[in-house]
């Protein structure tokens, strides 16, 4: 006889109501029919593609590092719409509403021609080619070679109202009972951090901290050998409860293995047959080959063809529905645009005479320099929105970011303090205690510790959308252009109808 018995495990009890719920911004943000266009200046930068060029004493950076394999993190600030002089009081009533911006569209403009830039290392850890080996090659104490290659092709941008979050692998702390770790591979852990302007992205060697995980300084190219390669943490940003770090993103990556090499040096993890006697599970030994060659294989990738048919830039993108709860609302009147693009990765070669008197070609009297340039222009379509000053709405905004209410000059009234305070006279007297420290009244920037390319749009807004390329595209695709045209239909005057009276002739009688 079969009987049903309940499980002996713990019983799940759902939480008692009410449960805190994060609302979508569309539930409490009221959108208006007022749109603004904002466009930045031409943003230019010039530098060395591989490293910072410092002065002779190393204290000053004379030429900054500007590489096509760097992230460009723009921090775009817009004017406060609550300080606008709006004549229509039905749109903005300071007693009932606060105004905010919403991003409806953007276009990331890029100048300069398409091009492929190579990177490399004059002492690259490459023992020999393993794709088509012709003979056995035993390693020596130094087998490094001068190797260059083109990196993985990357096009990517992420927009949000807080900085983009990146991830990378780094050395993890060693457990206390692990013993000596000399000569052993360190444990790894995944770390997160804000992607700043100038951070390197992955070019084919992984998103790792090369400062701590590349002891020989020869496993990767010069531009990342002393850097942390980051990759956007899309999993964390897509699961953000408020959705502020990534409204939406676009990315395109491609690569293929162009060369197959093997590292020089001792193999850290030996093949089990030779190390722990695995009874020939991995290879059969031979009398003529008593020692195995190095088995630390790796490829150098290539980004392949660069074409204008697959460009994410110089084209508009419209935000209809964001992936998170924040549907494009720019809290604190700022937007963060994180860009990665190495399809315009040409490095200039500039040659000058070392003594100024060279007539014939002599390589020893000619100095070669390298420079990389980048050109950007950012355009936005902003929609004016308003938020009602209601208790439920303000409670959620305060839980999300209390600094928003402070910028709106709103705050919760504290409970009255009835305690008696002490006030001393003669504060500078030696007989009186030291005065209390005066608190800093200047508001601290929550992102002041990070490096961004600041773009000020305070005087770049315009209501004349039809005067700008992105504005005309927005008017056309949204149907506002046809609506404006229909309102200007001219009314034709009706022509007056002429009426002629027929004169009746008198009949003559004889």
Swiss-Prot record:
Its main location: virion. Keywords: Capsid protein, Disulfide bond, Host nucleus, Host-virus interaction, Late protein, T=7 icosahedral capsid protein, Viral attachment to host cell, Viral penetration into host cytoplasm, Virion, Virus endocytosis by host, Virus entry into host cell. One of its GO terms (cellular component) is host cell nucleus. GO terms for biological process: endocytosis involved in viral entry into host cell; virion attachment to host cell. Residues 126-147, 488-510 are annotated as: Disordered. It is found in: Virion; Host nucleus. InterPro entries: Capsid_L1_Papillomavir, Capsid_L1_sf_Papillomavir, dsDNA_vir_gr_I_capsid. The keyword Transferase does not apply. One of its GO terms (molecular function) is structural molecule activity. Residues 490-510 have a biased composition (Basic residues). HAMAP family: PPV_L1. Belongs to the papillomaviridae L1 protein family. Forms an icosahedral capsid with a T=7 symmetry and a 50 nm diameter. The capsid is composed of 72 pentamers linked to each other by disulfide bonds and associated with L2 proteins. Binds to heparan sulfate proteoglycans on cell surface of basal layer keratinocytes to provide initial virion attachment. This binding mediates a conformational change in the virus capsid that facilitates efficient infection. The virion enters the host cell via endocytosis. During virus trafficking, L1 protein dissociates from the viral DNA and the genomic DNA is released to the host nucleus. Self-assembles into homopentamers. The capsid has an icosahedral symmetry and consists of 72 capsomers, with each capsomer being a pentamer of L1. Interacts with the minor capsid protein L2; this interaction is necessary for viral genome encapsidation. Interacts with protein E2; this interaction enhances E2-dependent replication and transcription activation. This is Major capsid protein L1. It comes from Human papillomavirus 22. The lineage of its organism: Viruses, Monodnaviria, Shotokuvirae, Cossaviricota, Papovaviricetes.
């Amino acid at each position: 006889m079969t009987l049903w018995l309940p499980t002996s495990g713990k019983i799940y009890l759902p939480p008692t109501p009410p449960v805190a719920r994060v609302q979508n911004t569309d539930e409490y943000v009221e959108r208006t029919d007022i749109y603004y266009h904002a466009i930045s200046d031409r943003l230019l930068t010039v530098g060395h593609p591989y490293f910072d060029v410092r002065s002779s004493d190393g204290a000053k950076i004379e030429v900054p590092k500007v590489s096509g394999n760097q992230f460009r993190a723009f921090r775009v600030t817009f004017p406060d719409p609550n300080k606008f002089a709006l004549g229509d009081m039905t749109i903005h009533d300071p007693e009932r509403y606060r105004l905010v911006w919403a991003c409806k569209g953007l276009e990331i403009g890029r100048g300069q021609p398409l091009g492929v830039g190579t990177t490399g290392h004059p002492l690259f850890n490459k023992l020999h080619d393993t794709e088509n080996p012709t003979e056995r090659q035993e390693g020596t104490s130094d087998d490094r070679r001068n190797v260059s290659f083109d990196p993985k092709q990357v096009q990517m941008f992420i927009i949000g109202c807080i900085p983009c979050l990146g991830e990378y692998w780094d050395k993890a702390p060693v457990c206390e009972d692990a013993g000596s770790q000399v000569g052993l591979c360190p444990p790894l852990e995944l770390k997160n951090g804000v992607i700043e302007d100038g951070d390197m992205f992955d070019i084919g060697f992984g998103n790792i901290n090369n400062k701590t995980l590349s002891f020989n300084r020869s496993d990767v190219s010069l531009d990342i050998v002393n850097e942390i390669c980051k990759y956007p943490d899309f999993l964390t940003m897509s699961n953000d409860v408020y959705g502020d770090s990534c409204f939406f993103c676009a990315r395109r990556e491609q690569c293929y293995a162009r060369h197959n090499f093997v590292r020089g040096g001792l193999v850290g993890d030996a093949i089990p047959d030779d190390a722990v006697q695995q009874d020939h599970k991995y290879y059969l030994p031979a009398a003529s080959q008593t020692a195995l060659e190095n088995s630390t294989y790796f490829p150098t990738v290539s980004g392949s063809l660069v074409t204008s048919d697959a460009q994410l830039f110089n084209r508009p993108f419209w935000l209809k529905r964001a992936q998170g709860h924040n549907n494009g609302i720019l809290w604190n009147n700022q937007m963060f645009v994180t860009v990665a693009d190495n399809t315009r990765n040409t490095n200039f070669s500039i040659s000058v005479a070392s003594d100024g008197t060279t007539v014939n070609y002599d390589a020893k009297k000619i100095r070669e320099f390298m420079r990389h340039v980048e050109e950007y222009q950012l355009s936005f379509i902003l929609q004016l929105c308003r938020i009602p000053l209601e208790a439920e709405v303000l409670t959620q905004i305060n839980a999300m970011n209390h600094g928003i209410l402070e910028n709106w000059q709103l705050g919760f009234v504290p409970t009255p303090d009835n305690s008696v305070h002490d006030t001393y006279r003669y504060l500078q007297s030696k007989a009186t205690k030291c005065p209390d420290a005066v608190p800093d009244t200047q508001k601290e920037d929550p992102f002041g510790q990070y490096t961004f390319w600041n773009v000020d749009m305070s005087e770049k807004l315009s209501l004349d959308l039809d005067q700008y390329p992105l504005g005309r595209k927005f008017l056309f695709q949204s149907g506002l252009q046809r609506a404006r045209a229909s309102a200007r239909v001219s009314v034709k005057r009706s022509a007056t109808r002429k009426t002629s009276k027929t004169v009746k002739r008198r009949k003559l009688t004889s």
